[in-house]
């Protein structure tokens, strides 16, 4: 019973240790998670925190990073020594000859790589672990960016539904007034038909938006890795993230911070060190063997020390080709680095231009178009009662106001999604 308790306790301790190891992010990812707390939208901030803990893609990237950190001490370790033990006997025909009638041998051997090889392997392992850390951050920020885009899309859909329902209620009032005027022969019947047609179109759009709403909720829950039916709320108004960064500052940020570019950089560094390691393959590795020998029959004791060395005899087909291979891989990694830098630069520049465009459009909509559209609808409602304008003019003013309201929310969402694009490239929250 005591033994079984000890086994259970040991297993529980191992489980806790494994859970703790799995739950501990790398320092750069931990810094990103601390920044996530400052995201303006609290519900979105909570979703980000939950995603970084539960998303299987992020957890897999974390485990790959942890695995590579355990490779580092292995890379600088000597190969395991070999224990040698033997007993040798020879049945001779001559009874008086006792030589080799009971020879015992005990010793060991140790393989010793050429000086500098273990250091190079250790350095390559460190670079690879650093690369996996950058990849861990890149995966994390990419998943978070995907989550934020879906969340902003959900906000836009929710806001569109809210605007449509408000205008639908207003249109129902206008339809009632058109019915009254038609009943008193002050308006044509086509005004009533047009109102009913627009109400039906409102219903069609609401059905489509509600389906899109549920799809987005499912997508977000899938990213967070939880029950797909959990409801997700969005704020009544989405805060607009201030953006005062310059293009030069963002380009410098790509070189200094981008985890995607850092992965390529580490690949090139690893390939460069691999060239040096492959060049060291021209130098011999050694094996030192020491043995204690005892002949029990005659009581003789002796020692044997053997030094072995590998000879790169076939260097033309092996070492030469290995060096050329590593050089080619290094050049390929440099090209990948440049290609990634160009792609990231394009993404940031494009997002930068769209952000400035959305800022101008948001100001134009808020300061000019929306107030004018509201004023036009209000004045047309008053004029319609007195017969100053027809129903179609008033309906057109309502639809124009609705279009401007939806467009404003759409520009706000585009602004936030392009901020997210830059965040994904730089690996930080702006």
Where are each of the predicted segments found?
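Amphipathic alpha-helical coiled-coil segments
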Residues: 60-72, 139, 143-164, 173, ...
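Bacterial N-terminal signal peptides
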Residues: 8-15
């Amino acid at each position: 019973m005591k033994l079984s308790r000890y086994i259970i306790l040991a297993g529980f301790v191992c489980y806790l240790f494994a859970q703790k190891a799995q739950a501990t992010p790398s320092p750069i990812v931990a810094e990103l998670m601390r920044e996530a707390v400052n995201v303006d939208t609290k519900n979105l901030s909570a979703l980000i925190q939950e995603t970084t803990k539960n998303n299987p893609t992020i957890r897999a990237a974390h485990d790959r990073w942890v695995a590579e950190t355990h490779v580092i001490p292995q890379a600088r370790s000597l190969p395991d020594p070999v224990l040698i033990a033997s007993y040798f006997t020879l049945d001779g025909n001559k009874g008086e000859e006792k030589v080799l009638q009971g020879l015992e041998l005990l010793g060991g051997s140790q393989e010793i790589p050429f000086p500098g090889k273990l250091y190079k392997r250790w350095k390559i392992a460190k670079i690879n672990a650093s690369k996996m850390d950058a990849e861990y951050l890149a995966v994390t920020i990419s998943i978070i960016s995907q989550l934020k885009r879906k969340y902003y899309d959900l906000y836009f859909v929710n806001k569109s539904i809210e605007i449509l329902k408000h205008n639908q209620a207003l249109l129902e009032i206008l339809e009632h007034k058109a019915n009254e005027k038609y009943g008193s022969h002050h308006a044509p019947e086509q005004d009533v038909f047009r109102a009913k047609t627009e109400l039906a179109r409102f219903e069609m759009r609401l059905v489509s938006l509600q389906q899109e709403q549920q799809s987005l909720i499912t997508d977000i829950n899938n990213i967070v890795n939880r029950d797909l039916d959990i409801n997700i709320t969005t704020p009544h108004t989405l805060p607009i993230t201030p953006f005062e960064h310059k293009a030069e500052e963002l380009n410098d940020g790509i070189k200094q911070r981008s985890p995607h570019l850092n992965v390529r950089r580490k690949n090139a560094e690893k390939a460069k060190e691999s060239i040096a390691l492959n060049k060291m393959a021209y130098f011999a590795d050694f094996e030192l063997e020491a043995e204690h020998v005892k002949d029990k029959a005659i009581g003789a004791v002796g020692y044997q020390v053997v030094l072995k060395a590998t000879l790169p005899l076939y260097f033309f087909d092996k070492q030469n080709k290995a060096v050329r291979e590593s050089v080619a891989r290094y050049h390929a990694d440099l090209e990948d680095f440049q290609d990634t830098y160009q792609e990231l630069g394009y993404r940031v520049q494009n997002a930068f231009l769209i952000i400035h465009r959305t800022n101008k459009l948001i100001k134009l909509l808020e300061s000019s178009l929306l107030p004018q559209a509201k004023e036009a609808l209000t004045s047309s409602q008053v004029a319609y009662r007195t017969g100053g304008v027809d129903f179609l003019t008033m309906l057109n003013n309502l639809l124009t106001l609705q279009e401007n309201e939806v467009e404003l929310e759409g520009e706000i969402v585009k602004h936030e999604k392009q901020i997210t694009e830059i965040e994904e490239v730089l690996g930080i929250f702006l």
